Amino acid sequence: MENMAEEELLPLEKEEVEVAQVQVQVPSLASAPEEAKSKRHISIQRQLADLEKLAFVTEGNFDSTSSLNSDNLDAGNRQACPLCPKEKFRACNSHKLRRHLQNLHWKVSVEFEGYRMCICHLPCRPVKPNIIGEQISSKMGAHYHCIICSATITRRTDMLGHVRRHMNKGETKSSYIAASTAKPPKEILKEADTDVQVCPNYSIPQKTDSYFNPKMKLNRQLIFCTLAALAEERKPLECLDAFGATGIMGLQWAKHLGNAVKVTINDLNENSVTLIQENCYLNKLKVVVDSKEKEKSDDILEEGEKNIGNIKVTKMDANVLMHLRSFDFIHLDPFGTSVNYLDSAFRNIRNLGIVSVTSTDISSLYAKAQHVARRHYGCNIVRTEYYKELAARIVVAAVARAAARCNKGIEVLFAVALEHFVLVVVRVLRGPTSADETAKKIQYLIHCQWCEERIFQKDGNMVEENPYRQLPCNCHGSMPGKTAIELGPLWSSSLFNTGFLKRMLFESLHHGLDDIQTLIKTLIFESECTPQSQFSIHTPSNLNKQEENGVFIKTTDDTITDNYIAQGKRKSNEMITNLGKKQKTDVSTEHPPFYYNIHRHSIKGMNMPKLKKFLCYLSQAGFRVSRTHFDPMGVRTDAPLMQFKSILLKYSTPTYTGGQSESLVQSASEDTVTERVEMSVNDKAEASGCRRW
């Protein structure tokens, strides 16, 4: 009937109806009131081809997203821009029109959920009444049409902020019904035998609700090995992934550790929570909400399939959740700094539990935004050769202060600083005594700006008359002005626990995580401060021989810990004594703080030895030495900088001799070597005088 009525219209009347329709309604199965709202502006399109089609629509072939105007349909091959008036852009050839649409409309658009809000020059902004009451058109100008509330925004930056405010309020549904109701298919990624669905633009946090970063794979594997090592101490563990996003980390815990863990995945974003639940069903895991299993999980599984485990998914603020419930393991991975969640994490964490903190605000931690580091962490830092370890000690100091405020101490299990993140994992020790011992390990660092020698300040509250005396170098006496700077406060104790790292290595071998085994081995060498040649990997058949070294998990101390947790009582005197003995042993074998970069301290006009040979030379000289994961060319050693340079010069060959033998260079006297080292230090100081911090 509608087609017959349309055919009865005269051609002139039909053309007038088409001109009056500025926006064409989208055909849908919705009711009539909903169809009245299903209108969107023609400047909002999915692809550039859809925008180009608007200018090439012929009569009788109207697209649902077209806006037809009599000016757009010119005779011949000339076409007018559908988003510009005739006065602004005259009709032109098709290739010029395509270039115009691409450069002046599509490239300056604002993207939201697969749609592009292109810039519009049509007189579609609301008119303004004057004093008399007559309506006058506003000044012709470019503007955007909001995809959510249909508002018109002039500037692109204002449009971005406008859409961002909608997202912060949770208003992500458009006020119209899209032309194609089918959503773009979600991509399925696989990592560690775990499948996850990800949204489009999943690697760009500004363009998606559920952020998934493939570059954080090492971080997720380190956290998994940490939890697997903790699961051997006591079972079951209450685990929390406070910022789930796609839920990949919690899914790996539940899928590979099974009944040893009770996983809770939390996220504040509703879309992320929905995606986490879908990923749970994808991996055959039941979703538990308020201690009740969702009936949907049983319907999705096919015949013969069984659920692997249960996961509790919550939607609330991470601080609120950590105040309401107690956990054995908490992982914090917010977008940016994590200092806003540390107090809540230590509020209800159980004794001997583990808190892992991932910080991605590397611009402030790596001394690129020093004012932000002062604001977030309350410390003063500068860019040094050991800036990555400096960042790790800054985060540990913030964690230690948060734990001390809750009458808890910490034991650092390991700290990793890589290109994209800083990961710190600590064990929680309850009691004011542990809190006081932890607070004493937060100290200031004295850093020489000329030679980059460094040392932690001595304990005590008395003001020292000349703090430069604490530095091993004599730059203050030979250089003018103030040569040192005070950094911190920082964590001054050890960053690694050798026994726990060996247990993590065993778990990585057990679960087949080959990507992080090299990193964990480097951490073990670094914690013991020994060359790699002195380390050997033991097979599972030799685990009984390695019980005292921490590879085998069920030791005597672990049995005492299990009994204590089962009884739910305070620590016995025997356990406190064993803990004190263990701390004394750890202090005696504590690795030296910080490291030296061999390239940074190279001698001008000399060829350096290979790094492996140089480590052997330092070890033969009686110093503890190892490589470090913080810097591929870094050397962790307890040798002072003067001795470090002396040995480096001793085994370096001059460049001008054309390969002089090492025996001739080694025959130089110690006095001559020392003089040459001092001369090289002075030359570098004069050359770098213009780059003082």
From Swiss-Prot:
Q: Quote the record's binding site residues for Zn(2+).
A: C448, C451, C473, C475
The residues that the entry says bind S-adenosyl-L-methionine are: R220, D267, D317, A318
Q: Which Pfam families match?
A: TRM
**Motif Nucleolar localization signal in this chain: where?**
95-99
**What does the UniProt keyword field contain?**
Isopeptide bond, Metal-binding, Methyltransferase, Nucleus, Phosphoprotein, RNA-binding, S-adenosyl-L-methionine, Transferase, tRNA processing, tRNA-binding, Ubl conjugation, Zinc, Zinc-finger
Give the SUPFAM superfamilies listed for this entry: S-adenosyl-L-methionine-dependent methyltransferases
List zinc finger spans: C2H2-type.
144-166
Alphabetical GO CC annotations of the entry are:
nucleolus; nucleus
Q: What are the EC numbers? A: 2.1.1.-
Reply yes or no: does the keyword tRNA-binding apply: yes
User: Where is it predominantly found?
Assistant: nucleus
**Cross-link (Glycyl lysine isopeptide (Lys-Gly) (interchain with G-Cter in SUMO2)) at residue(s):** K545
Where in this chain does the record put each Trm1 methyltransferase domain?
Answer: 187-648
Q: Which PROSITE patterns match?
A: SAM_MT_TRM1, ZINC_FINGER_C2H2_1, ZINC_FINGER_C2H2_2
Q: Which residues form a coiled coil?
A: none
Biological role stated in the UniProt entry:
Specifically dimethylates a single guanine residue at position 27 of tRNA(Tyr) using S-adenosyl-L-methionine as donor of the methyl groups. Dimethylation at position 27 of tRNA(Tyr) is required for efficient translation of tyrosine codons. Also required to maintain 3-(3-amino-3-carboxypropyl)uridine (acp3U) in the D-loop of several cytoplasmic tRNAs.
Q: Which family does it belong to?
A: Belongs to the class I-like SAM-binding methyltransferase superfamily. Trm1 family.
Which protein are we looking at? tRNA (guanine(27)-N(2))-dimethyltransferase
This protein's gene is called: TRMT1L
